[in-house]
C-alpha cells in the first residue's frame, strides 16, 4: 500500500526476508540511492533510514549526516542516533510528500510484476506530478506492467517524455451506464512525441474535456473562448486548442477521433480555397 509505505517498519534481521520497502532499503544501497535521488528531485531532501532508532526504522528527511573521522563505533551509533532524531520524519509530513515517497518506494522495490496506482498525482503540484509521471515510465520500471488511473495532464506529459515507447493511453467515458473505451497505442503516441508542435501543444489535455475546439491560432482560441464564456457561461467550457494553421487540422482531428473526443473545427474562410484542407477535416457538422 503506497499510502503507508513510508511509515516506520519493524527492523528485520538480515538472515530473514525483507518484509517491506524500508527493510529493503537497509540491504540494497542502489535501491536507497534511487529512492533518495527521486525524492530529492521533487523536494530537495534526501531520504535517510534511521537504523539507529531501535526496533522500528523510520525514514528521516534531510542531508545524510557524516560522522567525524576516527570516531569509535559505539560513539558513531550515538552520533547518528542523536543527529537523525533531530531530522523531520517522512510519515509526519503532508500528503504530497508521503504519497510521492510511498509510490517511489513501491515502484522501485521491484517486488511486483504488475501494479495498479490510482491517481498518483494526488496532493502534488503540477511540476511534481510531471516528475512522478517521468519516474513511473522510466527504465527503472521496465519489465513490469503498471496500470495508472489519472486526471492529470502533467502526469501524462511526464510519462510521454520519459517512456513514450512503453505507454498506451486508454480514455474511459461513461454515458447512460455504458462505458466507452478509446485507445492510443504506441504508434499513436509516437506521432505525438515525434512531432514538435503536437508534443508541446495542449493536446493531452483534451483527454479530460467533453469537447475540444480546434482553432488556427492562440488569438482565435482566446476570442472564441471569450464568446463561449459570455454566451454559455453555465455550460462546461470546452478546451480551445490552437493547431498552428489550417494545414495542421487533420493531424489533430485524426487523434481526437481515435480517442472518441467530440471536437469542432473553427477555421478562417480561406480554408475554402484549398479543397484538400476542407476535405481533410469535414465531418458532419464539426466545421464552422
Where does each model-flagged region fall?
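A generic structural signal for well-ordered alpha-helical segments
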Residues: 39-40, 139, 256
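Residue-level detector of anion-binding/catalytic polar loops
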Residues: 46, 145, 262
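Extended helical coiled-coil dimerization/tether regions that scaffold
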Residues: 2-100, 105-114, 126, 275
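Acidic, divalent-metal-binding catalytic cores of TOPRIM
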Residues: 157, 172-288
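Active-site-proximal structural scaffolding
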Residues: 32, 96, 125, 148-149, ...
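Switch/communication elements of ASCE P-loop NTPase nucleotide-binding domains
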Residues: 67-205, 222
Amino acid at each position: 500500500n503506497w499510502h503507508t509505505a513510508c511509515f516506520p517498519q519493524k527492523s528485520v534481521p538480515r538472515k530473514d526476508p525483507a518484509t517491506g520497502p524500508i527493510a529493503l532499503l537497509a540491504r540494497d544501497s542502489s535501491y536507497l540511492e534511487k529512492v533518495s535521488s527521486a525524492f530529492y528531485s521533487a523536494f530537495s531532501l534526501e531520504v535517510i533510514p534511521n537504523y539507529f532508532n531501535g526496533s522500528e526504522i523510520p525514514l528521516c528527511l534531510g542531508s545524510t549526516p557524516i560522522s567525524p573521522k576516527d570516531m569509535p563505533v559505539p560513539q558513531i551509533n550515538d552520533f547518528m542516533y542523536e543527529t537523525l532524531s533531530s531530522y523531520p520524519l517522512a510519515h509526519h509530513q503532508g500528503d504530497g510528500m508521503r504519497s510521492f515517497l510511498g509510490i517511489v518506494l513501491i515502484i522501485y522495490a521491484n517486488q511486483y510484476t504488475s501494479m495498479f496506482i490510482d491517481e498518483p498525482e494526488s496532493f502534488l503540484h503540477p511540476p511534481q506530478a510531471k516528475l512522478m509521471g517521468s519516474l513511473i515510465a522510466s527504465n527503472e520500471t521496465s519489465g513490469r506492467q503498471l496500470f495508472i488511473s489519472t486526471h492529470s495532464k502533467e502526469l501524462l506529459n511526464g510519462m510521454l517524455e520519459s517512456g513514450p515507447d512503453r505507454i498506451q493511453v486508454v480514455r474511459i467515458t461513461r454515458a447512460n451506464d455504458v462505458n466507452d473505451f478509446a485507445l492510443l497505442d504506441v504508434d499513436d503516441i509516437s506521432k505525438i512525441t515525434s512531432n514538435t508542435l503536437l508534443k508541446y501543444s495542449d493536446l493531452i489535455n483534451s483527454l479530460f474535456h467533453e469537447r475540444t475546439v480546434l482553432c488556427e491560432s492562440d488569438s482565435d482560441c482566446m476570442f472564441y473562448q471569450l464568446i463561449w464564456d459570455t454566451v454559455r457561461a453555465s455550460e462546461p467550457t470546452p478546451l480551445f486548442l490552437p493547431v498552428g494553421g489550417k494545414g495542421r487540422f487533420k493531424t489533430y482531428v485524426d487523434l481526437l477521433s481515435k480517442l472518441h473526443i467530440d471536437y469542432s473545427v473553427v477555421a478562417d474562410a480561406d480554408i475554402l480555397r484549398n479543397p484538400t484542407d476542407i476535405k481533410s477535416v469535414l465531418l458532419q457538422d464539426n466545421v464552422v
